[in-house]
Amino acid sequence: MKRENVSRIFSKIPTLTTERFILRRISIDDSDDMYEYAQNKEVTKFLTWSPHENKGHTFEYLTYLQTRYASGEFFDWAIVCKESGKMIGTCGFTRFDYKNDCAEVGYVLNPQYHGQGIMTEVVGRVIRFGFENLALNRIECRFIEGNIASRRVMEKNGMQFEGVLRGGMLIKGEYKDIGVCAILKKDFSKKE
């Protein structure tokens, strides 16, 4: 996997689909839908970022993302319900280790849609894209200890729990323990 190939693919981010969702480029038009969950303290409790203070904050963030897409430096999709057209979260690659053909997946979902298997479905599609289109060997997800629902999404997608990085990340001024789950291409192929 080469940085240039990933940048080329994501500068014109492909649209992906699942049974219930469309995964597409995040747009400035998603501002209201994103703000709906991004301002929620419960949503950001297990994330590295703080709640958006107002709709202007969300709009500025989405404007910034457009420049990152254009330069091939942003690797997230908007999760859009096929039925309603509503954007309900994001999912994508948060970092790449190009030398070792490894990437990390991250995600966030509007809490109104929790408990419906949405992230399991969406993360599964992103994992498939990583192995089939980006030639990855390993895909991992990290979660703040205590985020049981997120770990469950990972395990339902065939990821194995590999351990905890004690004090592994400074988040909002506090060192947090970070759980790591991962799947290898060979294990994904067996699962299929």
Predicted regions span which residues?
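Conserved GNAT-fold acetyl-CoA-binding loop/helix
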Residues: E42-Y64
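Acyl-donor (CoA/ACP) binding surface of acyl/acetyltransferases
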Residues: M1-K45, D76, V80-E192
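Short, surface-exposed helix-loop/turn micro-motifs enriched in polar/charged residues
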Residues: W49-S50, S71, D101
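A short helix-loop-beta-strand connector motif used in the catalytic cores of GNAT acetyltransferases and
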Residues: Y64-A78
